[in-house]
């Protein structure tokens, strides 16, 4: 255990700060069980706070018992434990493994503050499995880099201190100090790809080539280094392409070679937190979205959003609710919560300083998101026009036109938030504030 602790300490020394807090991702399995022991010892020696987070997926009938076991083990060490219960969304077409992993990291993300270190228990055998799964998918250097030992995560960093340690060494240490841990029965189910590799493939590879795991780790490191070098070389180009609104300039992108263009698209999606696209998806982004006809409104659906085009720039747009049917009355000086994360809107009385004249029946004011069939006459325009045309003139992207609040009086447009006030309602009684 001392040798393992020495290795653990060396990894953490590179990342520890004066106000660092250790957060252990604690499933209760043997890897995280040993990790908890190491983190507790390190925290005591360096006078650091240490806590644990257990994610309850609800996939096993033993899950509640695992929570009790984890709570007992943390209590023995006086380590605070938080239990996060998650619901898996299996409608997206992802495997149960992938959805569980995504839900787990999303739950952990909420617990990581500035300078925190999230410690996870992946080891060298996990790295081999990840590498082989990436190879099966036909991944390039990015995917074959597998898992990084440390990386930014939420407001802190994610550290995998055991990534260079074989599973058998972790189990040997656990037995040596008399630890108990939970066993996930699904780990024996070879219908899952990772379990198939673990149970049937890796033992044969390791028996034939004992240094196979170390060789895979070396290859993964080389792939990561090549990918990092490519990022470094293309960063000046990427910074020219990338806009303040997180869009990408199509004209400048078209001046790059196809290889550079695809890499820059990957860098863009990675910066926005989107999973790595396939080569086919990259080709579709370029051919069907970037190069579509000037009057087209192209859309390419990805796993976590849509790629859209506007004013010769590419945008990654989140999948949003259809708000066409949403409407609500608005009361003076009372913030109105808007749906789908669009913030609040408030009509504030400010006599003599406002932009809108109050109609006689202010109780007939309401908010809508549906511009269909509506017209308005902005004060600075010569005549009335359909809202569809006005949105185009005011350079509002098509996907935001049904997400921009419209202030209505009966069936008349009073104002469009952030754009204009209809000339019929120009005055100084009140102002419309949209806080996104």
Curated annotation (Swiss-Prot):
CDD domains on file: TilS_N
Main localization category: cytoplasm
Enzyme class: ligase
Residues the entry annotates as binding ATP: 27-32
Any Gene Ontology CC annotation: cytoplasm
Keyword field: ATP-binding, Cytoplasm, Ligase, Nucleotide-binding, tRNA processing
MF GO annotations: ATP binding; tRNA(Ile)-lysidine synthase activity
EC number: 6.3.4.19
Catalytic activity: cytidine(34) in tRNA(Ile2) + L-lysine + ATP = lysidine(34) in tRNA(Ile2) + AMP + diphosphate + H(+)
Top-rank lineage group of the source organism: Bacteria
Compartments (UniProt record): Cytoplasm
Example GO BP: tRNA modification
The keyword Cytoplasm appears for this protein: yes
Family, as annotated: Belongs to the tRNA(Ile)-lysidine synthase family.
Function: Ligates lysine onto the cytidine present at position 34 of the AUA codon-specific tRNA(Ile) that contains the anticodon CAU, in an ATP-dependent manner. Cytidine is converted to lysidine, thus changing the amino acid specificity of the tRNA from methionine to isoleucine.
Entry remark concerning the domains of this protein: The N-terminal region contains the highly conserved SGGXDS motif, predicted to be a P-loop motif involved in ATP binding.
Record protein name field: tRNA(Ile)-lysidine synthase
Provenance organism: Vibrio vulnificus (strain CMCP6)
């Amino acid at each position: 255990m001392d040798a393992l602790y020495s290795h653990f300490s060396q990894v953490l020394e590179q990342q520890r700060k004066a106000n660092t807090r250790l957060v252990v991702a604690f499933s209760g399995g043997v890897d995280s069980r040993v990790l908890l022991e190491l983190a507790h010892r390190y925290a005591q020696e360096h006078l650091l706070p240490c806590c644990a987070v257990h994610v309850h997926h609800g996939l096993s009938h033993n899950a509640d018992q695992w929570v009790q076991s984890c709570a007992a083990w943390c209590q023995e060490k006086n380590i605070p434990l938080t239990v996060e219960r998650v619901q898996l969304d299996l409608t997206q077409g992802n495997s149960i493994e992938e959805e569980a992993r995504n839900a787990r990291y999303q739950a952990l993300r909420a617990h990581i503050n500035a300078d925190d270190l999230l410690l996870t228990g992946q080891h060298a055998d996990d790295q081999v499995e990840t590498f082989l799964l990436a190879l099966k998918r036909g991944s390039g250097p990015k995917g074959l880099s597998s898992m990084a030992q440390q990386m930014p995560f939420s407001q802190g960093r994610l550290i995998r201190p055991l990534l260079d340690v074989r599973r058998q060494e972790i189990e040997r240490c656990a037995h040596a100090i008399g630890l108990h841990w939970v066993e996930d029965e699904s780990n024996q189910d070879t219908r899952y790809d990772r379990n198939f590799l673990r149970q049937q493939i890796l033992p044969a590879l390791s028996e034939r080539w004992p240094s196979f795991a170390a060789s895979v780790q070396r290859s993964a490191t080389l792939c990561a280094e090549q990918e990092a070098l490519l990022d470094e070389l293309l960063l000046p180009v990427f910074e020219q392409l990338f806009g303040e609104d997180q869009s990408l300039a199509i004209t400048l992108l078209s001046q790059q070679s196809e290889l550079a263009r695809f890499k820059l698209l990957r860098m863009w999606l990675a910066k926005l937190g989107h999973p790595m696209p396939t080569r086919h998806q990259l080709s579709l982004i370029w051919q069907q979205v970037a190069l579509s006809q000037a009057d087209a409104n192209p859309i390419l659906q990805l796993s976590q959003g849509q790629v859209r085009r506007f004013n010769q720039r590419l945008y990654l747009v989140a999948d949003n609710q259809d708000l066409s049917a949403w409407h609500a009355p608005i009361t003076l000086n009372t913030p109105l919560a808007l749906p789908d994360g669009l913030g609040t809107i408030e009509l504030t009385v400010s006599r003599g300083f406002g932009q809108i004249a109050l109609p006689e029946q202010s109780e007939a004011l309401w908010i809508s998101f549906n511009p269909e069939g509506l017209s308005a006459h902005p004060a600075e325009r010569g005549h009335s026009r359909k809202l569809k045309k006005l949105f185009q003139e005011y350079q509002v992207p098509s996907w935001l036109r049904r997400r921009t609040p419209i202030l209505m009086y009966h069936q008349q447009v009073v104002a469009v938030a952030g754009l204009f006030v209809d000339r019929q309602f120009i005055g100084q009684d009140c102002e419309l504030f949209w806080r996104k």
